[in-house]
């Protein structure tokens, strides 16, 4: 969501994103400008990461420790612990390919950039979707729901999202859920500062007459 801050009657409210995922991506962004995110704002890893609520007042607590998450899965569905570990190994591999080899190295001018030796080896993951992959591994509906929801942050449905995007599950369970100590607006202020250092000028509450590309 859009990171905003609302102040009223002496109170300050953090508005927008619920949590801070993929801290390595933020770190890389600031490093591009010779900055360290840790020098600009402080983040704290949440433990537990979050709790998922279901009907009938049932809930599942998601720990910040992947080993504990595996135990939680195993307690809910026998045999699911080992399946989750293998699933996350694949998700981590996909994450490193998507972020390190694709996001940072490809200019994004053509879809043909996505075709290389590594992506060809994962071609089968583009032929099925998150929904089918998760349902094929896990029987319990709660576990299925937990594993399917991260792709919603991509603005997509599990049934329409290629299984390659299970790297979002690694972002969730592997990298964990974080929160900026003073709210997300600290991240916004840091980005504004960098933009201004690069010569960007911000015109607020102004009409847009033209978009130059």
Locations of regions flagged by a protein language model:
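Flexible loop/turn segments at secondary-structure boundaries
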Residues: 1, 154-155, 210-211
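N-terminal glycine-rich phosphate/pyrophosphate-binding loop and immediately adjacent elements
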Residues: 1-96
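General beta-strand structural signal in soluble alpha/beta enzymes
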Residues: 15, 145-147, 204
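Alpha-helix capping and helix-loop boundary segments enriched in small/acidic/polar residues
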Residues: 17, 159, 178-182
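Active-site substrate-recognition segment that forms the wall
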Residues: 39, 158-161, 193-194, 210
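Rossmann-like flavin
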Residues: 55-161
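Helical element adjacent to the flavin cofactor pocket in flavoenzyme catalytic cores
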Residues: 125-126, 135, 166-212
């Amino acid at each position: 969501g859009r990171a905003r801050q609302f102040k009223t009657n002496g109170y300050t409210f953090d508005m927008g994103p619920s949590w801070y995922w993929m801290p390595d991506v933020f770190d890389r962004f600031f490093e591009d400008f010779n900055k360290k995110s840790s020098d600009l704002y402080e983040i704290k890893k949440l433990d537990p990461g979050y709790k998922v609520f279901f009907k009938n007042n049932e809930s599942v607590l998601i720990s910040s420790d992947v080993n504990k998450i595996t135990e939680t899965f195993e307690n809910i569905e026998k045999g699911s612990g080992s399946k989750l570990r293998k699933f996350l190994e694949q998700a981590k591999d996909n994450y490193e390919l998507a972020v390190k080899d694709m996001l940072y190295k490809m200019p994004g001018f053509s879809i043909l950039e996505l075709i290389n030796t590594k992506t060809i080896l994962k071609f089968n993951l583009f032929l099925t979707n998150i929904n089918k992959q998760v349902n094929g591994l896990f029987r319990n509906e709660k576990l299925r729901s937990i594993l399917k929801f991260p792709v919603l942050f991509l603005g997509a449905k599990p049934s329409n999202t290629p299984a390659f995007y299970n790297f979002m599950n690694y972002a969730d369970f592997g990298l964990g859920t974080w929160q900026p100590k003073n709210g997300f607006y600290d991240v916004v202020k840091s980005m504004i500062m960098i933009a201004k250092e690069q010569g960007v000028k911000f015109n607020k509450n102004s009409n847009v007459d033209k978009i130059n590309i």
